[in-house]
Amino acid sequence: MAFRQALQLAACGLAGGSAAVLFSAVAVGKPRGGGDADTRATEPPAWTGARAGRGVWDTNWDRREPLSLINLKKRNVESGEDELTSRLDHYKAKATRHIFLIRHSQYHVDGSLEKDRTLTPLGREQAELTGLRLASLGLKFNKIVHSSMTRAVETTDIISKHLPGVSRVSTDLLREGAPIEPDPPVSHWKPEAVQYYEDGARIEAAFRNYIHRADARQEEDSYEIFICHANVIRYIVCRALQFPPEGWLRLSLNNGSITHLVIRPNGRVALRTLGDTGFMPPDKITRS
C-alpha cells in the first residue's frame, strides 16, 4: 500500500509541474554548453599521503608517533598502564632536528648535458656567501646530504670548505624533478604526465627518508644540511607543514637560499626561515 501511495504522489507531482525540477536534478553536474563534465581527478597522488582534513594536524605524519609503534595486542594485562607507559617512553623522541635546505647556486642553464650545467662565476660567489652564513651560525652541523646533480655537487664543494669536518653524502633521491602537478597550473612549464609519476614518487621517497622526528636513540639536537633544488625544497616544505603539496609552485626560492625547518620530539614542525638570502648583497641575488 505504501509503495502504491508513493507512486500516486509522484504522478501528482509530475502533473503539477515538478517534472522540470526532477529533470533539472538529473542534469546537475553537466556543463551548460552540453559537453562532458571535467572528469580529471581532484585528489593528489596516493604517495603524498591522505590528509586528515582541512585544519587537522596529523600527529603521526611520519609514522613515528610512539603509540603507533607499539603492538597493543601483546600488552600484559597484569602490569597494565605501567607497562604501556614504559614502552611509550622507549619509542619517544627526545631530540629536535634542525633541517637546513639549501638551494644550489646559479648555474649555466644552456648546457646540453646535465654535467655541462656547472655553476656560473656568480653562482660560485653565492655558494661562498652561503657557506660563510652557515659557518657564522656557530652550530655543530652533523652532516651534509646533497643531490648528485652537477650544480648541487659544485655548490656542496664550496660550502663544505667553510664547514670542515662535516661529513657529506650524495643521493639521487634529491635530484631535481616534477614532484606533483601544480595547482593552479602554469602555461610555461608542463612536464609529461609520466615525469610526475616517476619524479613524484622519488621526491616523496626523499621526504619520507629524510624528514621525520628524531630517532628515540638520539640524545642531542641535530643540525643537518640538505643541498638540492627548488622544486624538491618547495615540495618538502609543503609536505612537512601539511599544506596541500600541489601548492609548491606558489613558493619562490633564490639561488643559494637557506630554508630552516624544525622538527620537535612530539612531531610538531615549524618553518623558521624560507628562502633566506638576506646575507647576500642585492646584486648577488638571482633565481635562475
Swiss-Prot record:
Residues 76-81 are annotated as: Interaction with KEAP1. Its EC number is 3.1.3.16. Dimer. Forms a ternary complex with NFE2L2 and KEAP1. Interacts with BCL2L1 and MAP3K5. Upon TNF-induced necrosis, forms in complex with RIPK1, RIPK3 and MLKL; the formation of this complex leads to PGAM5 phosphorylation. Isoform 2, but not isoform 1, interacts with DNM1L; this interaction leads to DNM1L dephosphorylation and activation and eventually to mitochondria fragmentation. This is Serine/threonine-protein phosphatase PGAM5, mitochondrial. Signal peptide: none annotated. The gene is Pgam5. It is an enzyme of class 3 (hydrolase). It is a single-pass membrane protein. The modification N6-acetyllysine is found at K115, K143, K190. Mitochondrial serine/threonine phosphatase that dephosphorylates various substrates and thus plays a role in different biological processes including cellular senescence or mitophagy. Modulates cellular senescence by regulating mitochondrial dynamics. Mechanistically, participates in mitochondrial fission through dephosphorylating DNM1L/DRP1. Additionally, dephosphorylates MFN2 in a stress-sensitive manner and consequently protects it from ubiquitination and degradation to promote mitochondrial network formation. The record marks S24, A25 as: Cleavage. It is found in: Mitochondrion outer membrane; Mitochondrion inner membrane. Belongs to the phosphoglycerate mutase family. BPG-dependent PGAM subfamily. GO terms for molecular function: protein serine/threonine phosphatase activity. GO terms for cellular component: mitochondrial inner membrane; mitochondrial outer membrane. InterPro entries: His_Pase_superF_clade-1, His_PPase_superfam, Mito_Ser/Thr_phosphatase. It catalyses: O-phospho-L-seryl-[protein] + H2O = L-seryl-[protein] + phosphate; O-phospho-L-threonyl-[protein] + H2O = L-threonyl-[protein] + phosphate. Phosphorylated by the RIPK1/RIPK3 complex under necrotic conditions. This phosphorylation increases PGAM5 phosphatase activity. The N-terminal 35 amino acids, including the potential transmembrane alpha-helix, function as a non-cleaved mitochondrial targeting sequence that targets the protein to the cytosolic side of the outer mitochondrial membrane. The modification Phosphoserine is found at S79, S86. One of its GO terms (biological process) is necroptotic process. Its main location: mitochondrion. Residues 1-6 are mitochondrial matrix. Disruption phenotype: Deletion mutant mice were born at mendel ratio, but weighed significantly less compared to the wild-type (WT) controls at 1-year and older. About 50% of the mutant mice (aged 1-1.5 years) showed lordokyphosis (hunchback), odd gait and swollen foot, and among them about 50% died from unknown causes. These suggest an accelerated senescence (or aging) phenotype in deletion mutant mice. Keywords: Acetylation, Hydrolase, Membrane, Mitochondrion, Mitochondrion inner membrane, Mitochondrion outer membrane, Necrosis, Phosphoprotein, Transmembrane, Transmembrane helix. It comes from Mus musculus (Mouse).
